[in-house]
Curated annotation (Swiss-Prot):
Cellular component terms (Gene Ontology): nuclear membrane; nuclear pore
Zinc finger (C3H1-type): 1-25
Keywords noted in UniProt: Coiled coil, Membrane, Metal-binding, mRNA transport, Nuclear pore complex, Nucleus, Protein transport, Repeat, Translocation, Transport, Zinc, Zinc-finger
InterPro entries for the chain: Znf-CCCH_4, Znf_CCCH, Znf_CCCH_sf
Region: Disordered, residue numbers: 161-297, 315-463
GO biological process: mRNA transport; protein transport
Gene giving rise to this polypeptide: AMO1
Polar residues composition bias: residue spans: 195-215, 243-253, 321-338, 351-366, 388-429
Protein name: Nucleoporin AMO1
SXFG repeat placement: 171-174, 200-203, 213-216, 228-231, 240-243, 249-252, 262-265, 282-285, 303-306, 314-317, 348-351, 370-373, 387-390, 407-410
Keyword Zinc among UniProt keywords: yes
Native organism: Chaetomium thermophilum (strain DSM 1495 / CBS 144.50 / IMI 039719) (Thermochaetoides thermophila)
Lineage: Eukaryota, Fungi, Dikarya, Ascomycota, Pezizomycotina
Subunit and partners: The nuclear pore complex (NPC) constitutes the exclusive means of nucleocytoplasmic transport. NPCs allow the passive diffusion of ions and small molecules and the active, nuclear transport receptor-mediated bidirectional transport of macromolecules such as proteins, RNAs, ribonucleoparticles (RNPs), and ribosomal subunits across the nuclear envelope.
Recorded coiled-coil stretches: 114-141
Length: 557
């Protein structure tokens, strides 16, 4: 329990009702962390008892991760006040809503918002898996926290070390009291980072040399087999029972420390940030912790999203020549800059690396590649192909193969069954590598030149023949009330299920769904109504009386 600072100064108006600890006064050498000092005797000559941390119990963990689980689960969790370790946290598990939003906008600027959404979905699912693994092993979770008291450096050691380093300069966040250790002589930084002059807030070196989170390695609840959302692979059985260090970068891309730019250590478009020079400066005007690096666009150093490009005279005036397959955040054969430039041994968000790794009983990483390094199938725009009305917009080539006009919410044909009014070939990508696309029946008129995307271009199947993923999202089968068999669904970020209505792909062509007289589709009023719906999401002049042409529709929903 935290010692009351007013009690240390000789007064406390709350007395025995104070929620902070009042240690006995006198000549005793009182140490709240006496169990960590290594001595065999405590006060009064008694044998030291194992440390006790208020709030660390199986019931508390069960309650925290079930009935009191917060809505935003991409956060750290450490039960027990002043405990030497937390169950899980640190990057990439510990991210704010604003950081996730920034990640999406980076994907949107790159022309591939759906890829960013898929990666965010993978991160959310990995966090859920950590929580479930913890709930299934609560006794081991408690023991993991207790064992961390004998592993150094732990969170308590880092707090002590940061108090020594705070005398060299002002902290980035100010000189505040450390919640894990009280010292009347030197107020501590609550983030556990030593303050060094002229150091960026997002890349402070640590005197302890510890990697991972500010309080040790993000510890607990890692899935044993599922892939980590942000790329933390390791060899199964290669580490101890509590996991192994991270070898992958933020989004599944390995990186050498100092070889690639940080998302906070370079300007977004090669321009000065807040009046600072463009190269080698942080986006917040501070020098980059990794040294001078080129801008993310228009250079051969690698795109900010992992796809290597050739040098272009202007970041927006020339189409990038991709040397690797287009991928939402790229996994080229050569190492490239990942989305947020994290090195192979990622530093803490608050700069506390570690020489040892606090092991995790639920942190058996997977040998599979990161969800952020998986090549995503190319998705079409929300409504598919170019317009029938001759207003095809020529967009600049993009390394991700995505039109820049894609919806900001990455719907991409996920919410509408209509494509652009036209007969051009669909832009949805080909089947995954190694997948043999079977000959499928066309839903369009036999004389139409338009082709419907094959089912395997946006979905994968399991050995049993059922759907495994659909547009990059995992598929679950649920049996609705009154139904005879389960039907496939995809799970949204909020946990709701959305039914897949066309699990077998497009149906065969039938003229029954079109107007009897095909000449009605030549009417400008009909074209204008459907074009308005495709562009704005609503009909011009009310609901049309003419059904859409088959060539205007897709069945990938």
């Amino acid at each position: 329990m935290t010692v009351c600072r007013f009690w240390q100064q000789g007064y406390c108006r709350n007395g025995n009702a104070c929620k902070f600890e009042h240690p006995p006064k006198g000549g005793q050498n009182y140490n709240r962390f006496g169990a960590l000092s290594g001595s065999g005797q405590g006060m009064g000559g008694r044998v030291s008892e194992p440390p006790h941390y208020p709030g660390l119990s199986e019931d508390a963990i069960q309650k925290d991760l079930t009935s009191e689980l917060p809505t935003w689960i991409l956060s750290c969790y450490g039960p027990g006040r002043d405990a030497p370790e937390q169950l899980f946290g640190g990057y990439p598990r510990e991210q704010s809503f604003e950081e996730i939003r920034l990640h999406f906008y980076n994907g949107l600027m790159a022309g591939n918002p759906q890829g960013a959404l898929n990666e965010i979905q993978a991160a959310y699912q990995a966090a859920q898996q950590q929580i479930q693994n913890t709930l299934q092993n609560i006794p081991a979770a408690v023991q993991f926290i207790l064992d961390a008291a004998n592993k150094h450096p732990n969170r308590i050691d880092i707090c002590r070390e940061s108090s020594k380093g705070s005398s060299t300069g002002g902290s980035v966040f100010g000189r505040n009291v450390n919640p894990f250790q009280q010292s009347s002589a030197a107020p501590l930084n609550p983030f556990g980072a030593p303050s060094t002059p002229s150091t960026s807030a997002f890349g402070q070196p640590s005197p302890l040399g510890q990697k991972s989170s500010a309080f040790g390695t993000p510890a607990f609840g890692q899935p044993s087999q599922p892939v980590s959302a942000f790329g933390k692979p390791s060899a199964l059985g290669g580490g101890s029972a509590f996991g192994s260090p991270q070898t992958g970068s933020t989004f599944g891309q390995p990186s050498v420390l100092g070889a690639k730019p940080s998302a906070f250590g370079q300007p977004a478009f090669g321009q000065p940030a807040f009046g600072q020079p463009a190269f080698g400066q942080s986006a917040f005007g501070q020098p980059s912790a990794l040294g001078p690096k080129p801008g993310a666009f228009g250079t051969s150093a690698g795109s900010a999203f992992g796809a290597s490009t050739t040098t272009a005279p202007s970041p927006f005036g020339a189409a990038a020549q991709a040397t690797q397959p287009a991928n939402p955040f790229g996994q080229p054969s050569q190492q490239a800059a990942n989305s947020f430039g994290k090195p192979a041994a990622p530093a803490s968000a608050f700069g506390q690396p570690s020489t040892t790794t606090a092991q995790n009983p639920f942190g058996q990483p997977s040998t599979q590649s990161s969800a952020f390094g998986q090549q995503q199938p190319q998705q079409a725009g929300t409504f598919g192909s170019p317009s029938l009305f001759g207003q095809q917009q020529q967009q600049p080539s993009n390394v991700f193969g995505q039109p820049s006009t894609t919806s900001a919410f990455g719907s991409q044909a996920a919410t509408s069954g209509f494509s652009q009014l036209g007969n051009a070939t669909s832009t949805i990508g080909a089947s995954p590598a190694g997948a043999q696309a079977p000959a499928s029946k066309s839903p369009y008129h036999p004389g139409s030149t338009r082709q419907h995307p094959d089912l395997l271009s946006y979905a994968t199947k399991n050995p049993a023949g059922g759907l495994d993923t659909f547009k990059g999202k995992p598929v679950v089968y649920e049996t609705p009330k009154g139904a005879a068999k389960p039907v496939p669904h995809i799970r949204q970020f909020d946990g709701t299920l959305v039914r897949i209505w066309m699990p077998d792909g497009a149906p065969a062509y039938t003229a029954d769904t079109e107007a009897e007289d095909p000449k009605v589709y030549e009417d400008e009023g009909v074209k204008r109504q459907w074009q308005s719906f495709l562009e704005k999401g609503r009909f011009e002049g009310g609901m049309p009386e003419v059904p859409p042409r088959r060539e205007w529709c897709v069945w990938d929903f």
